[in-house]
């Protein structure tokens, strides 16, 4: 499987830059009207590929070595017939456009005629929300005075999205049949340098795309690079170990830009599992994923953005809170109640208040009404006699065995305590005490916490990394020296537990949803007193080229499921930061 680099900003994502060639396979934009992602693809060829010619002959880029400037801007350096070539993809903050920059240095002792540029084609537009379908609309390509080149757009009755290049005057473009090539030639003396910067803009229609590119041209590459690197540096999290710092910050920015973004058509902030179509349920919203995993890292690094996220959750997403998954506009995608997802907005709000000390958010009308809605839904899930609450689906989104989950009710305990304080309702604190007592009475068997029970004598011993019993101390439900919790963790991490992968190179917990060690389990280990083993496991896996995936092979550490798992990347960054402290 090829390795990929990624980058992007709020509006544009480049989710699949091939490491072997440097080519962009496609780009994605969020579209509120389409309720998900639109991907512009090249089909059997890349959307954008770097091209180098020496003496009129195409020279293959070889031995590409990649780095991520300030943990996010991908830069490759390689060789091509006596040239050292550097390729950079830069998506400046807040812009609907990006740079492709090619630099060449002549390492030979004779002059070289060098041409630097790109080649590409837009032959398909894909709509992605969990599933992928190809649009059967009309794509157009025509000359434009806005960029002195051409513009391309997808038309579905009205324009849906558009794509346009621009460059300095020396760059020459050829185009036709939804394909294009553009670049510039120069004679390079020995030791000489050359550079070409090509800009691509996106928009709902052609004028927006062309002028978005033109705006970047006016700003200039160096200014945009300086501002972007400065923005990233300000938000990077510290760690003494350089390897941990790199992994933490690369996953932080991957989550920041791929688990949230702004729509091309309405410019609204929205949240999703991943803006990469390489993730198997991309471009849809889960309360759990966005608020329990991605959000803790965001609130560490950008309080204003975290506040905007919560306002989005308590407006766009609150109507269907607790339901399995939703479109980015808040309407229902997959039905099915999940108790941990109902709790997620409250827990995220707590994280924001603790980090920022900004109680004013609690006075926002949408937050007040949203908390009331969460409480009213919670009431409908309460057992008629016992202070425990049921769920329909588990934290993996799979069907339950029994309806009363220990982990879920630990979250309910926390939520009731918080709502008691925020809503000034002492009765909720008493109910929280009742939940804890009921968990210890009904959800403990053989000296350990069970996974779930029907309250009629049946229970199961199990664990799921997306909602692990290992996290009970993390949420404050019990202490790490609680003998019941310690017994539970020993049991699910022991060789006797079939999904523990104990004594394998990656000895982290899996589950039936994906029967391999989960990266979320590594996160859980970092947070529950097993940081040393978790860091050792991380050292043995590349995950998805250094970025979080769902699960990895227990022996090789290769990605098994869920590549480009952006919300998980946020939780990994947060867990690494917590462990580094």
Which residues does each PLM region occupy?
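Terminal accessory carbohydrate-recognition/targeting modules of carbohydrate-active enzymes
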Residues: 1-239
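C-terminal capping/lid segments that line or modulate ligand- or cofactor-binding pockets
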Residues: 1-39, 282-285, 335-341, 345-355, ...
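The feature captures the catalytic groove of carbohydrate-active enzymes
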Residues: 195, 199-214, 279-280, 325-327, ...
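An acidic-aromatic substrate-binding cleft motif
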Residues: 214-274
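Long, well-ordered core segments of solenoidal/helical folds
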Residues: 251-263, 301-324, 366-387, 430-448, ...
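Aromatic-rich carbohydrate-recognition surfaces in CAZymes
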Residues: 280-384, 409, 563-581
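Extended ligand-binding clefts on enzyme/binding-domain cores
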Residues: 283-287, 373-376, 383-391, 402-411, ...
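Extended amphipathic alpha-helical segments enriched in small hydrophobics
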Residues: 405-436, 531-541, 569-580
């Amino acid at each position: 499987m090829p390795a990929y680099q990624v980058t992007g900003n709020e509006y544009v994502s480049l989710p699949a830059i091939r490491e072997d060639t440097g080519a962009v396979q496609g780009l994605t934009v969020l579209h509120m009207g389409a309720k998900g992602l639109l991907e512009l693809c090249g089909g059997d060829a890349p959307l954008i590929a770097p091209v180098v010619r020496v003496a009129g002959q195409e020279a293959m880029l070889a031995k590409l070595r990649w780095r991520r400037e300030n943990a996010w801007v991908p830069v490759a350096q390689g060789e091509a017939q006596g040239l050292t070539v550097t390729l950079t993809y830069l998506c400046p903050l807040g812009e609907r456009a990006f740079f492709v920059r090619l630099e060449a240095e002549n390492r030979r002792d004779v002059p070289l005629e060098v041409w630097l540029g790109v080649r590409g084609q837009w032959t398909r537009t894909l709509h992605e929300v969990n599933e992928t379908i190809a649009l059967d609309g009309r794509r157009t390509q025509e000359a434009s005075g806005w960029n002195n080149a051409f513009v391309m757009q997808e038309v579905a009755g009205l324009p849906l999205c558009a794509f346009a290049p621009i460059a300095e005057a020396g760059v020459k473009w050829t185009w036709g049949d939804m394909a294009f090539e553009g670049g510039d030639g120069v004679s390079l003396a020995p030791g000489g340098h050359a550079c070409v910067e090509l800009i691509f803009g996106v928009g709902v229609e052609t004028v927006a795309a062309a002028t978005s590119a033109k705006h970047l041209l006016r700003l200039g590459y160096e200014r945009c690079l300086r501002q972007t690197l400065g923005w990233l540096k300000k938000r990077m999290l510290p760690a003494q170990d350089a390897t941990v710092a790199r992994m933490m910050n690369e996953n932080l920015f991957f989550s920041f830009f791929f688990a949230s973004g702004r729509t091309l058509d309405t410019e609204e902030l929205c949240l999703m599992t991943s803006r990469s179509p390489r993730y198997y349920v991309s471009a849809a919203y889960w309360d759990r994923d966005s608020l329990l995993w991605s959000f803790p890292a965001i609130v560490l690094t950008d309080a204003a953005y975290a506040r905007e996220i919560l306002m989005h959750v308590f407006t766009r997403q609150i109507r269907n809170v607790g339901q399995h998954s939703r479109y980015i506009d808040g309407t229902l995608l997959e039905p099915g109640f999940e108790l941990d997802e109902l709790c997620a907005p409250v827990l995220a709000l707590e994280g924001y208040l603790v980090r920022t000390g900004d109680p004013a958010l609690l006075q926002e009308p949408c937050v007040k009404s949203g908390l009331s809605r969460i409480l009213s839904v919670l009431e409908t899930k309460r057992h008629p006699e016992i202070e425990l609450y049921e769920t329909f689906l588990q934290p993996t989104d799979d069907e339950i065995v029994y309806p009363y989950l220990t982990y879920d009710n630990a979250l309910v305990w926390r939520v009731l305590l918080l709502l008691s304080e925020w809503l000034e309702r002492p009765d909720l604190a008493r109910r929280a005490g009742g939940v804890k007592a009921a968990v210890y009475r009904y959800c403990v068997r053989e000296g350990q916490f069970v996974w779930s029970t029907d309250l009629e004598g049946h229970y199961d011993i199990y664990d799921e990394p997306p909602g692990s019993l290992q996290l009970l101390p993390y949420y404050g439900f019990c202490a790490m020296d609680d003998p019941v919790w310690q017994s539970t963790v020993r049991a699910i991490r022991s060789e006797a537990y079939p999904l523990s992968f104990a004594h394998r190179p990656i000895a982290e917990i899996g589950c039936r949803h994906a029967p391999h060690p989960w990266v979320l389990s590594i996160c859980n280990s970092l947070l529950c007193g097993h940081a040393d083993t978790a860091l050792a496991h991380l050292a043995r896996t590349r995950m998805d080229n250094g970025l979080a995936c769902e699960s990895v092979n227990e022996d090789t550490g290769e990605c098994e499921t869920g590549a480009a798992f952006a919300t998980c990347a946020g939780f990994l960054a947060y867990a690494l930061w917590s462990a580094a402290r």
